[in-house]
Structures are given as C-alpha cells and as structure tokens.
Regions:
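Small-aliphatic-rich amphipathic alpha-helix that forms the alpha element of a beta-alpha
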Residues: 32, 82, 88-134
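Solvent-exposed alpha-helices and their adjacent loops that cap or buttress functional pockets
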Residues: 39-42, 73-76, 138-144, 163-165
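Short, surface-exposed loop/helix-turn segments at secondary-structure junctions
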Residues: 60-64, 132-137
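C-terminal helix-cap and adjacent tail motif
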Residues: 3-12, 17, 21, 140, ...
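Short, charged/polar surface micro-motifs in flexible loops or helix N-caps
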Residues: 52-57, 88-90, 156
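N-terminal amphipathic, basic helical "cap/leader" segment at the start of enzyme domains
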Residues: 1-80, 174-175
Length: 175
C-alpha cells in the first residue's frame, strides 16, 4: 500500500480481536520514531506502550467519570494503548501538541499499512491527564504530561479506499 492509499483508506477502528504481534508493534513504534518533532527536540516527547488490561480498564473508568457517562467505553476494549506525553511547561505555543498528534498519525498510518485496527484517543487521554493517581502509575519522566494517544490491535475490519468529499474542510486560496 502506498502512502496515499493508506491515507485515503484510514478510518477509526474500534473493534479488536487480539493484540498486535511484537513485530507489528515494533513497526508501529518505528513510524512514531520517524515523525517530525519541532526543532528536533525528541527529548520533549515520550511514548508509553500499555498492554496491561487492568490499567487500560482504569483509564476507561476515569473517562466514564470524566464524561459523566457510566456506559461509555472510550478505550473500546483495545489490547494496546500507546500514550504520547510531552513537556508542556515553559511553552506558549502549540508545538508540543502538534508533535504528539503527528507522532500518533504516523503510528495510525503504519497500522493501516499493517492491517491493524487503530484509533486516535483524545477524550480518555484528557481524562487520564486529569487523574493524578493514574498519571503516577505511568511512571512518566519528570515534567512530562499525557497529551494524546492511540489504541491498536488486530481487527477483522478491512481498509478500503473511501470517497473523500472535496470541501469537507473549508479551504481558502490566497493568490
């Protein structure tokens, strides 16, 4: 699959039937390592690969409380959650957030290429970041905060090219 095929086939997958193999997970992580980071400050981002079902369950529960929805399942019973954390202190721009989002998108596109299900996770990550006890369980390096993440795993869903409507995002041209 070429890059544009992966981009046009990408979708949020929320149904999983197993964990990625070690080789698949390493490929997904390699895509993260290939992501651009502002001013090449790679020491300002950190990945946490969580496959501990108990911890994923705690994050899911924190999100239920955060959204005041006891029926919510924002982690979708995923076997793996990859959290991207960053150093936010001392910044007054959006570079740390952009770095993390770019890292996640690279991992998602690699997952598409591998036929793995993947989905950006924002809400549960926000809930996690507001829960000091859960953040402590992550053993993040000093000064790092959870920013965004993705879930990934085996799926029976198939990626096929989607019709991408032009004009979906308002676009202005300045000549």
């Amino acid at each position: 699959m070429n890059t544009l095929d992966a981009i046009f086939a990408r979708k949020s997958v929320r149904n999983f039937c197993g964990a990625p193999s070690a080789e698949e997970l390493n490929t997904v992580l390699k895509a993260a390592y290939a992501a651009p980071v502002g001013r090449a400050l790679y020491d300002t981002v950190h990945l946490t690969v969580i496959s501990n079902a108990t911890l994923i369950g705690k994050i899911n529960e924190a999100a239920r409380v955060f959204f005041n929805n006891p029926e919510a399942n924002p982690m979708y019973d995923a076997p793996v959650y990859i959290l991207v954390s960053t150093k936010l202190s001392g910044t007054n721009d959006n570079v740390p957030y952009s770095n993390c989002a770019t890292i996640v998108e690279n991992m998602v596109l690699a997952s598409v290429e591998l036929g793995l299900g993947a989905c950006h996770i924002w809400g549960a990550t926000a809930a996690l970041s507001m829960n000091a006890d859960l953040v402590k369980e992550l053993n993040l390096p000093e000064g790092f905060s959870p920013c965004c993440g993705m879930i990934v795993g085996k799926t029976t869903e198939v990626y096929t090219a989607r019709d991408i409507p032009e004009g979906r995002i308002a676009t202005a041209y300045i000549k």
